[in-house]
Amino acid sequence: LRSLGLKAGDHMAVLLENHPRFFEICFGAQRAGIIFTAISTRLKASETAYIIENCGARLLVTSKALASLADDIVPLTPAVQHRLMIDGTTLGHQAYETWMASQACTPIPDQTAGGDMLYSSGTTGHPKGVFIPPDSPDYDAPTSLMGICQTHFGFGPSSVYLSPAPLYHAAPMRFCMSAMRLGSTCVIMEHFDPERFLACVETHRVTHTQLVPTMFVRMLKLPAADRQLHDVSSLQFAIHAAAPCPIPIKEQIIDWWGPIVWEYYAGTEGMGMTLVRLSLI
């Protein structure tokens, strides 16, 4: 990133599906002091371009899977100076793999903390960028997300975290990055599928996961025989947020998985978090 002329405090945009390279890009930005904005892949070209221009991105990283959208936003994002594309390339985009192969493997001498600047959903107008200074709080502070993951959710080197949601959302991205900083293994689904989710839990002996209530509903709609096909006894924490969970749905999940369900309320702005677990009710 520094080789492209980006310096600490500059902005870049990440427009990717749940791709294996997603986090190497985010962690690279963090170590170089870059502020990165992950963007929903479900937006229209004009909506995507608005966020890219508004956040002041000098670099855009995308993938061949999103080539059509990436091509459409080129004329709408004149401030972008560099465009990298993973798994292939189109006109106006440099191949990410070729660019990476030319980079040095030694750490940069002046590593500076960067961070994310995510955008609101735009329900009251244009989406709004939420900038949180990278050093407030420190990543390992007890009140940081990483601190909460360690002290309340028990993340550690033996943990396996399953993330079934789009990584451009705040919770999936930030929880995965916190888990990896704590030495945990992260298993990331390309997209949520109820039966595939259960199979991943069994195959990878997943200990932690985070879902939204609609995912609970879809799993509960599976035939009982299909739900019992997979061993989910490794699960220790099932964390959910994003929307209130109907009481009957939560009760059915607890009957199935046991008293491991945690609910939290928080916001992209990082102003605080409220945690609720069954044993405290």
Language-model features, listed with the residues they occupy:
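Structural core segment of the AMP-binding/adenylate-forming
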Residues: 3-4, 27, 31-102, 107-110
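Conserved AMP-binding/adenylation subdomain of ANL enzymes
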Residues: 138-160, 164, 168-208, 222
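Phosphate-binding glycine-rich loop
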Residues: 1-11
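A short helix-loop-beta submotif of the ANL/AMP-binding
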Residues: 11, 17-45, 53-59, 73, ...
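Gly/Ser/Thr-rich phosphate-binding loop
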Residues: 116-118, 181, 206-211, 222-281
